[in-house]
Amino acid sequence: MRVAMLSILFCGVTGSAIDQSWSELIASMEKMHVAMASVAPTGRSDVDFVRLMIPHHQAAIDMAKTQLLYGKDPQMRRLAQEIITDQQSEIELMNLWLKQHKLEH
């Protein structure tokens, strides 16, 4: 239901007019929101930042993968690939930081 509402709000279309790529992009956002909402605040800005950024970056990766599946524009496809590469690297860096500080994701 929430995905359908977001679709209506953001593009003014209903049900059958929503294509597969749009549905997958919205699903990536929904997954991110659930993951971010499950992060308990610690009161430590660095920790909270990293724990929230990891699902945010993962959503960017998931959306970029959707772009590679459905997108046609070469410039947007290159951008999607760069996003995947950069965001994966940054997730690894953040996970390493959490590990070095003996914190969990």
Which residues does each predicted region cover?
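His/Met- and acidic-residue-enriched segments that coordinate or traffic transition-metal cofactors
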Residues: 2-5, 11-105
